[in-house]
């Protein structure tokens, strides 16, 4: 049942992506983790990309942006694209990544709430947004 995701799916949506994300919802945050017992943001994205898209990507959010993505306009975001954030005052590097779904929703491993779905238009995510990217390699 997709209602738990609060996203209205159509026949054009990648059901495997949503099924996989649904299985991760609520997994606790663990820095350096990449399993449902504990996962960080890049570990979550890496696992989804491996399972759903059969692609190997970098293990660090800044490196994913640098080595695996081409930058796209936020208005061109499509299901499976990535959204990147700079959430730390201590560094100017990208520190967070999530997977765009649709209707401004994205899935990510939040350090405070674990794997969840958030809205890119929430104040926090607008303030810390860095770029949108499409995985090309």
Place the predicted regions along the sequence by residue.
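Intrinsically disordered, low-complexity
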Residues: 1-27, 136-137
């Amino acid at each position: 049942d997709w209602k738990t995701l609060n996203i209205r799916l159509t026949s054009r949506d990648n059901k495997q992506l949503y099924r996989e994300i649904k299985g991760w919802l609520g997994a606790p945050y663990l820095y350096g983790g990449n399993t449902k017992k504990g996962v960080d943001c890049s570990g979550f994205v890496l696992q989804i990309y491996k399972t759903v898209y059969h692609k190997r990507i970098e293990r660090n959010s800044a490196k994913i942006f640098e080595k695996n993505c081409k930058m796209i306009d936020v208005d061109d975001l499509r299901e499976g694209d990535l959204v990147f954030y700079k959430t730390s005052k201590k560094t100017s590097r990208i520190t967070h990544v999530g997977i765009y779904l649709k209707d401004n929703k994205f899935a990510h491993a939040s350090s405070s709430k674990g794997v969840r779905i958030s809205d890119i238009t929430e104040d926090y995510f607008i303030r810390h947004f860095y770029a949108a990217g499409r995985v090309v390699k």
